[in-house]
A protein has these predicted regions:
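Hydrophobic alpha-helical segments of integral membrane proteins
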Residues: 9, 51, 61-77, 87, ...
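An internal, D/E-rich "acidic patch" concept
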Residues: 58-114
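Transmembrane helix irregularities
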Residues: 30, 139-142, 272
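Hydrophobic alpha-helical segments of polytopic membrane proteins
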Residues: 6-8, 13, 151
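Short loop segments and helix-boundary regions at transmembrane helix junctions
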Residues: 119-142, 147, 153-158
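Alpha-helical transmembrane segments of integral membrane proteins
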Residues: 2-4, 13, 19, 95-128, ...
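Hydrophobic alpha-helical transmembrane segments of membrane transport/permease proteins
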Residues: 15-66, 151, 155-194
Length: 335
């Protein structure tokens, strides 16, 4: 088990290095001049050239990349030309909002899919099975952008039940910063009014993001539970007189969860892509919105910093998934 984890860690290093390489050179291919952006539209060519020399933007690409890697190893992600702040400071500011949004969406989608997929498998061929499969198709097929606008139109414009976007109402005072997660910080400080307001702002973007997770996981859970129900050990457990709930909990779900856990790590990649759209539509001040604005402004350092952080989160989550998989399946642990 230790060797497997060590190999995963070594593989992570190469993956992250490859991401820095691809992101760096792609950002240089995109048309635009960061020095001009930093200097402003009224700056003279001499001032623009001075800034390019100062930040090393006129050096050969291989030299720029070497400087970038050296700074990266020292924890320096560079300077954002848009916010005029250190990229590491920006990421520390915007990342908690994205973690809160994506984490709630992943949890909601997984739990609902676990319940729906299991019920659909146990009631195969019934109306409950058909409803579960239909909801899975809807979750996978509805475009994220269209669903976000539709929910805004229905629940904010028409019904007025939920806010349009943002993390809090304009007049609401944020809780003291502890974790950066507004729901957690408001509970830790006993500010329940802020907690309710933060949850209200979370509902629509979380539902939009969770739809894709739910759609894929329902199909996987249904198929996995059906496969497990046909195994000899399940029929043996039922023949011994064990209750349906005990058979489900101890024998069916433990084995049916293996494919679901594997896909769960890949789902984060889909969430990362959806976050860019959802945060833009709902004006959610997270890392996806920050990266989207950085790409539009051709802000090299901010784009690469945000991409690297998302990549680190992705490989770390997949490492955790691998470890959980080793725990769930002893055949791999002792192989």
């Amino acid at each position: 088990m230790g060797m497997l984890i060590a190999r995963r860690l070594a593989f992570m290093v190469f993956v992250l290095w490859g991401i820095t390489l691809v992101t760096f050179f792609l950002s240089r291919v995109v048309p635009g001049d960061p020095a001009r952006l930093l200097a402003g539209p009224q700056a003279s060519p001499a001032e623009v050239a001075h800034l390019a020399r100062f930040y090393g933007l006129d050096d050969p690409l291989i030299v720029q990349y070497a400087h970038y890697l050296r700074n990266l190893l020292h924890g320096d992600l560079g300077f954002s030309f848009v916010t005029r702040r250190n990229v590491r400071t920006d990421i520390a500011t915007f990342l908690p909002a994205t973690i809160e949004l994506a984490g709630c969406a992943l949890l909601l989608g997984f739990v609902l899919a676990l319940i729906t997929g299991t019920v659909a498998a146990y009631r195969r061929g019934t109306s409950a099975d058909a409803a579960g499969r239909l909801s899975a198709i809807a979750g996978l097929s509805l475009p994220v952008f269209w669903m976000a606008l539709l929910l805004q139109l229905l629940f904010h414009t028409k019904l007025g039940w939920l806010p349009l976007g943002g993390r809090l109402d304009p007049g609401m005072t944020p809780p003291p910063h502890i974790t950066g997660l507004l729901t957690v910080d408001s509970l830790l400080t006993g500010n329940f009014a802020t907690f309710i307001n933060a949850v209200e702002h979370l509902v629509l973007p979380v539902v939009v993001l969770a739809a894709g997770v739910y759609g894929l996981m329902v199909r996987i859970m249904r198929t996995s539970v059906l496969d497990s129900l046909g195994e000899e050990y399940v029929r043996t457990a039922e023949a011994k007189g064990l209750s349906r709930w005990r058979v489900l909990r101890r024998h069916v779900l433990r084995n049916a969860m293996l494919p679901a856990v594997t896909v769960l790590g890949l789902e984060f990649g889909l969430l990362a892509a959806g976050v860019f759209v959802v945060e833009s539509v709902f004006q959610w001040p997270g890392l996806g919105n920050y990266a989207f604005q950085a790409i539009q402004a051709n802000d090299y350092n901010a784009t690469m910093g945000a991409t690297l952080v998302i990549a680190v989160l992705y490989v770390v989550i997949n490492l955790i998934v691998d470890i959980v998989y080793l725990y769930l399946d002893p055949r791999i642990r002792y192989a």
